[in-house]
């Protein structure tokens, strides 16, 4: 494309921004998904900016699940800022996602312009921003790590390109180091810079290595630091390293296909690692890698650099086994290379027109794909249709039915999931919950106990404690609730349950009422709603203002009894009888709890 006037280019930039907004405007109220539950919804540490210093010293602040507590303080900080603006309403988080995407696009334009020229660079950046396969990264708020780390790496490239001072002083590495606080794979900057110097700047291999050496040393130091900062409980979740490795070439082929034709997108694949190196799919993957290497060797320099970027970006998640062999948010960073390669060929006006139409098609497809991410039910209905062998997907779809009160349907989905993942502790927890809702307490308890036997993590202890509490067995629940909180201090649910149970046995409450009357009436309302924990807290507050209220002692005793705190209930009734010895209601309630011998 011939050079364009500045006003025309700025108009094209405005149009590109409008296209990105059009693609993602419908996602603003999409709900939280996947890891968002423990990174955002149940994470106490994002609820106050007072915790900001702790984000940078303790990986447990990233997630309420210790096994997911990886060191990503920049992500946690950004989420805390979103929470400060809107609590747990999804919209502020999605607004930030779109803002970060636009910033990524702006950096891509700056980075690519010196390689391809302005309009091809703008096309590449816009394609990246509206590409339908990137919808997972945009809708999965906890995947913000991909956005932030990409921004850090791109900013380093732009500084390297455009500032002699930054290049001579190595200040271009500062954004890279900051981006590493969002996600470790930014350490691939060194091989990318080597490729850039070799292919784009036409340096010799020795010169390119000398240029990349400072970033290589920084990358190694960052990797060591980040690994040491991860919580000791953190788990990557990977299985056999060999099986995982021989599967990845086919996964790369799949990712490349998604770039060309993003159909069949699924939020949770049912793929598993290949058992044999000679699996037909594995062989197809090897052939793809060979063709990729051949293309890098023969393609024009910008295309070769883009293809190299694609390969290098995928190496960290390909060499180190992870829980899933393929994930669509892993392609976000890798696709930067592919959009560069594609844009290199947009050199004529007719191709520019075709490229514009192509962008509009992608924007429309992205808008439609965002509707799948509208809520948990729409998402998991899509996943079970596209990944029917995924037991976790069937379980999560069952959870959406349980949330609607469709317990029988939820149980059927859970039971189907059990045929696919028979020893999945989280599934056992959910079977326990649904059996409890269906009234089969014996079956519910079996499932909760099996979950504890399979994996006694915070969720197993917490959900068993909640069930025990609701069954009037709070004294048994309290040790499990405390264990859940010990394992995960960041868990809002565990902390809230422990607080309620400890208030029941005389601990300090968190709620305040201005006087006896308001506290007593709040206790009555809680009794009517069968909210025993609140009733206990309110009546204890009332008694702190009027310890001679026999009615408050009676209501406290009744609430304690419903939770199973028998001894505490007896003491409350006896206190009431000391005040009003002839109160027949107090006497009758006491006999129900402690009948005369």
Model-identified regions with their sequence ranges:
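Helix-start (N-cap) detector for alpha-helical repeat units in TPR-like alpha-solenoids
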Residues: 391-392, 425-426, 458-459, 492-493, ...
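Short coil turns that delineate tetratricopeptide repeat
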Residues: 388, 422, 455-456, 489, ...
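Residue-level recognition of tetratricopeptide repeat
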Residues: 399, 433, 466-467, 500, ...
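Polytopic membrane enzymes that build or remodel cell-surface glycoconjugates and lipids
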Residues: 1-439, 456-459
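Position-specific recognition of the canonical hydrophobic site in helix A of tetratricopeptide repeat
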Residues: 402, 429, 436, 469, ...
